[in-house]
Amino acid sequence: MDTIAARALTVMRACATLQEARIVLEANVMEILGIAINRYNGLTLRGVTMRPTSLAQRNEMFFMCLDMMLSAAGINVGPISPDYTQHMATIGVLATPEIPFTTEAANEIARVTGETSTWGPARQPYGFFLETEETFQPGRWFMRAAQAVTAVVCGPDMIQVSLNAGARGDVQQIFQGRNDPMMIYLVWRRIENFAMAQGNSQQTQAGVTVSVGGVDMRAGRIIAWDGQAALHVHNPTQQNAMVQIQVVFYISMDKTLNQYPALTAEIFNVYSFRDHTWHGLRTAILNRTTLPNMLPPIFPPNDRDSILTLLLLSTLADVYTVLRPEFAIHGVNPMPGPLTRAIARAAYV
């Protein structure tokens, strides 16, 4: 299946180079399109030409690219247009070994397959405590009953620790059961002035320490903590104290947008509004997948099918921009006139 996807990507990118009718094509583009179009026309009985000039010819070439995108992604889109019918035989065209694929396309598909079939450490973009169900007012003393050290969440990436005079304790537990981190990068600071429960102000005295694995850590410096070593706080002074611990970032096995080069840009290209026809076509295609059909996914996709679909659909979007096809989509009423931000914004409502 990797070679099928690589051929589809190669052919679509070759079609995206046809920005002028009289353009001098590169030799490899002529070879790719010559073989691919010949095989495609023979199996589907379409009349795609290598140098489309009329609207009908541009439509035919775009429909060929659409067929290849759907076949490579394994999508059966169904009846979406009175002008287009998906040709299932296109998979046979892409399976033809005579159609070459570029090194770039093959490498990209190999990266998609390789990265989605395994896991690796990645810097996560969200706060470590993002999904906490409760938070506490920053800089306000809070001590639970029968405790001398109390740690609470006060933000998506922040905890604060209240300590009685002379208290020592381990605050590791507040990090447990969250995000399965491989490494957490922390910075701790003294809260110089804080409010007691009665509202009066109190100062944290110098001498309060935070240690990892028994080694005191300097305040205001990034600490690499594996989440397993003891994370101790100690207040040797004779007054109550508070410290703040910030998670600068953390590393885990969760997939991010860095798993594939330019994945963020590919997603933006897919979900961008070009016109109402493209908007309806993209929606109809993504309705047959697990991806959202109008707005980008909340979390990075982590399976091969989703990332491959985004890559292929982004390339099809480039072909759409170049060929400027005109055809109808069921349920879509194109609006005449120039494209404006207001028109694009209204399409997502």
UniProtKB/Swiss-Prot annotation:
Signal peptide residues on this chain, from the entry's feature table: none
Gene Ontology process terms (BP): fusion of virus membrane with host plasma membrane
Keyword annotations: Capsid protein, Glycoprotein, Outer capsid protein, Virion
Subcellular location: Virion
Domain of life: Viruses
Sites carrying sugar chains: N287
One GO CC term, this protein: viral envelope
Molecular functions (GO terms): host cell surface receptor binding; structural molecule activity
Assembly, per entry: Homotrimer that assemble in a complex of 260 capsomers on an inner scaffold composed of VP3.
Biological function: The VP7 protein is one of the five proteins (with VP1, VP3, VP4, and VP6) which form the inner capsid of the virus.
Family in the record: Belongs to the orbivirus VP7 family.
Protein name, per record: Core protein VP7
